[in-house]
């Protein structure tokens, strides 16, 4: 009943948006020389099927803001109402996708009202309802941590760039939602590394026995003629879905009052049922909900018991306060109770992050998660909704819980995270992954790490196995970009004056070898990429205290063979995504970046037309450019 009421609420909003266009243009009568009926008009929702895995933006109209269509008489209100309700009856999945992708409503709004695409967009984004009055603004209490962009570092003073791997993609999906809805994007909501890592790249598969491959490339920077870009790319081994270990999953679902929105709990339910479809008799599933208190809805049932899992998830209803800490404790207790040695033991938390009962401060929650992570149970955090999401809290929980953080803005994104990339989301192939790039002052005078601001580590923490890194899932990729300046570059670095010799500062190796790196030809190598990780298969049969496990060190010198006269398609795409991120942040480092130029360049790269996620990104950049 709750789902039906939310679906009807959605239908009313959808109806109001379509009718608003007719009201604004005064085309509200049923008369006229040309009649467009509801049956003759195809809305975006009708062309979105459950089998499609593309995001809503990919099927956005190809019309421009300047295009108009002949004025036609609007369909009668009752006919529109019947059509919209019919669309909803065809499936909540279709409704969710259509609503979240407001631009997809433009063709229908144009045909119903005979207005231009730009006018229809203004009507939708402003939510002007019949009568010409805009809808009352909703409170927005979304929380994002302050991000201070990484600046230029002088190699003479700081030759080491050290940071933890990050495979989260929440930031991109979240800002996509804002752009599609015509909302302003907060600068602190933009984490450029998560935007870059959302996309796949043509990195080679790792060699036999290796958890990941490493790709490096140096090419001219597209926004600064005085610098180059260094790409460091990791590609984890793609999973053989037929040989994956058994899973012990605990669905930890927020059913508090704040989840009582159609794009929160109902979307959570759809998402978890998608995941459950791929489980079998070797897997275990538990369901824990939390509101004012916590409830065990399902305990350790086999993945093959589809009917039982479906009934448990579909019967959930939202209401009450949010005692997330109680739910977290119970979820980990169940995960430990049904622990599968050598298997995938994971809590999957679905929430908007709005916690107001029990342990609520971020510091205490982080310590709680850190303690629970020692059990060998991993954590995936799925963020839902808008208006009150606590992005900072959800990211912190995932980072300290040996996990990953994704934002689910529609059912297509749920399908991408939980089915298409289930291996990466659910199965860890390398844990506590840390990267350290040591730059050669003979080749590089300064560098700037793009993104990863909240993953930067002290140089000495690289070799300290008690310091947490990031987790790399099966098939996941990590891409890091550095803007670098050669000694002869005009780029200002801000190198400090030094009174004493070169032996001070952090100019010592941190891999335990001691002393400076010995190289026969110091001009040949630009830098050395060092990576540390831990094998998740070790000590997986019991409590897994990361501080007691020794990491594995890999080193990859970067010499002139990595230098290219022009960017490869992979580097060009990653650089373009970074440029868009810098525009959204109004970065002081964006240089000559212009959206039109970025879009034009990216459209020429490989996979720009055959990769649905890249097509969607190009649509976003075009939409941003037209809104300027």
Q: What spans do the regions from the language model cover?
A:
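N-terminal secretory signal peptides that target proteins for export/translocation
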Residues: 1-7
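Short, low-complexity, disordered segments immediately C-terminal to signal peptides
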Residues: 28-55, 59-64
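Polar, glycine-rich mid-to-C-terminal structural blocks
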Residues: 378, 400-409, 414-479
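Exposed acidic/Ser/Thr-rich ligand/metal-binding surfaces
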Residues: 28, 214-432, 491-517, 608, ...
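Sec-dependent N-terminal signal peptides
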Residues: 7-18, 29
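Acidic/polar low-complexity segments with low predicted structural confidence
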Residues: 144-228
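C-terminal motif of bacterial Sec signal peptides marking the signal peptidase cleavage site
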Residues: 22-26
């Amino acid at each position: 009943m709750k789902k039906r009421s939310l679906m009807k609420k959605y239908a009313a909003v959808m109806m109001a948006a379509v009718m608003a266009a007719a009201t604004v243009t005064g085309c509200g009568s049923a008369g006229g020389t040309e009649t467009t009926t509801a049956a003759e008009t195809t809305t975006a929702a009708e062309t979105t099927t459950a089998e499609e895995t593309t995001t809503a933006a990919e099927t956005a109209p190809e019309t421009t803001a300047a295009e108009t269509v002949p004025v036609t008489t609007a369909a009668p209100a009752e006919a529109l109402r019947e059509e919209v309700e019919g669309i909803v009856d065809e499936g909540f999945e279709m409704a969710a996708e259509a609503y979240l992708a407001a631009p997809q409503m433009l063709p229908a709004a144009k045909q119903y009202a005979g207005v231009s695409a730009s006018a229809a967009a203004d009507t939708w984004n402003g939510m002007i309802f019949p009568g010409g009055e805009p809808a009352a603004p909703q409170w927005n209490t979304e929380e994002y941590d302050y991000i201070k962009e990484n600046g230029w570092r002088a190699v003479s003073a700081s030759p080491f760039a050290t940071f933890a791997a990050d495979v989260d993609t929440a930031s991109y999906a979240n800002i996509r939602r804002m752009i599609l809805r015509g909302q302003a994007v907060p600068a602190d909501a933009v984490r450029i590394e998560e935007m870059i890592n959302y996309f796949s790249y043509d990195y080679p598969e790792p060699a036999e026995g290796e958890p990941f491959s490493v790709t490096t490339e140096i090419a001219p920077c597209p926004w600064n003629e005085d610098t180059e870009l260094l790409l460091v790319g990791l590609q984890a081994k793609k999973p053989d879905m037929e040989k994956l270990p058994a899973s012990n999953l605990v669905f930890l679902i927020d059913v508090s009052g704040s989840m009582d929105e159609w794009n929160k709990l109902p979307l959570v339910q759809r998402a978890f049922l998608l995941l459950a479809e791929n489980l079998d008799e070797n897997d275990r599933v538990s369901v824990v909900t939390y509101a004012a208190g916590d409830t065990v809805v399902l305990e350790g049932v086999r993945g093959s018991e589809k009917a039982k899992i479906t009934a448990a998830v579909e019967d959930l209803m939202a209401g009450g306060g949010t005692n997330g800490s109680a739910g977290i404790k119970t979820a980990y207790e169940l995960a430990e109770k049904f622990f599968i040695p050598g298997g995938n033991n994971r809590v999957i938390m679905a929430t908007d992050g709005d916690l107001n009962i029990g342990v609520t401060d971020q510091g205490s929650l982080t310590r709680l998660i850190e303690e629970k992570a020692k059990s060998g149970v991993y954590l995936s955090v799925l963020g839902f909704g808008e208006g009150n999401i606590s992005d900072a809290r959800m990211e912190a929980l995932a980072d300290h819980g040996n996990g990953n953080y994704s934002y689910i803005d529609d059912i297509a994104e749920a399908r991408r995270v939980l089915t298409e990339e289930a291996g990466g989301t659910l199965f860890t192939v390398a844990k506590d992954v840390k990267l350290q790039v040591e730059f050669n002052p003979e080749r590089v005078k300064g560098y700037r790490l793009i993104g990863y601001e909240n993953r930067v580590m002290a140089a000495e923490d690289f070799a300290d196995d008690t310091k947490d890194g990031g987790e790399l899932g099966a098939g996941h990729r990590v891409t890091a970009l550095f803007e670098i300046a050669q000694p002869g570059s005009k780029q200002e670095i801000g190198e400090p004056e030094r009174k004493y010799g070169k032996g001070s500062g952090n100019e010592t190796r941190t891999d335990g070898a001691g002393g400076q790196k010995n190289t026969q030809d110091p001009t040949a190598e630009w830098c050395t990429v060092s990576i540390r990780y831990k094998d998740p298969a070790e000590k997986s049969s019991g409590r897994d205290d990361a501080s007691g496990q020794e990491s594995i060190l890999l080193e990859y010198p970067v010499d002139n063979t990595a230098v290219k006269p022009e960017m490869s398609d992979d580097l060009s795409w990653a650089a373009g995504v970074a440029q868009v991120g810098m525009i959204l942040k109004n970065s002081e480092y964006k240089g000559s970046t212009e959206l039109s130029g970025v879009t034009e360049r990216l459209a020429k790269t490989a996979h720009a037309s055959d990769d649905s996620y890249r097509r969607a990104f190009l649509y976003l950049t075009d939409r941003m450019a037209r809104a300027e």
